[in-house]
Amino acid sequence: MNANDLWRMLGWEFSLMVATVRLINSGLLDELPSLKIHVSHFGGGIARYLPRIRGLQDREKSGTAQIPRHSRMPREPFDHYLQHRLFYDCAGWSGPDYAAERGAEWVRVGLAELPSSQVLFATDYPQAVRQDEEVIAYVKAVCGLGSGARKILDDANAQKLIPNLKERLARVQLHAGNGVLQLAGEQGAAISTPVDESQ
């Protein structure tokens, strides 16, 4: 996987998809009912493979029900966990070229299988998408997909995932002009830390 950059092209996403399916089938989400999990990159693009995954979840039909390493099943149907227990983001599919078109297409595919109520907007800016204009075009392209896609652009889903998000963000201010990250303290005092802007 290291040769020809295959890990970055395919391995990373494949590993995310495998981890997502393993997480659901392990029963961990049943044992920890309040646990919230964020899976990046639409779970490694799991939406494209869901018809195959769903079909093979039926262990009797696939002939693996009597094999211990294959017979463990979660309490709820597989889609329950996909639709109610996991959160996803839409980063990872948009760059460095044609970010808007490719990224928006990936959002369309993801939202065809996963509910917009569980998806967070994200980009790989500045690692993969390097131009501000491409990010703006990406946002516009996602908006063009309709109201379901536009829902992922606000902060409602992030607030479900991260308790007290608005209050936490209000305490953090980045002053790019002077290279200092300021964290406002309880009494209004600030803790200043130099920021290396080259990263």
Give the location of each predicted region:
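Histidine/acidic residue-rich metal-binding segments in metalloenzymes
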Residues: 1-83, 101-117
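Short acidic, gly/pro-rich beta-turn/loop elements at beta-sheet edges
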Residues: 49, 98, 131
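Mid-to-C-terminal alpha-helical segments outside catalytic/metal-binding sites
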Residues: 26, 35, 45, 87-88, ...
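Short, flexible loop segments at the rims of nucleotide/cofactor-binding pockets, characterized by
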Residues: 14-16, 90-99
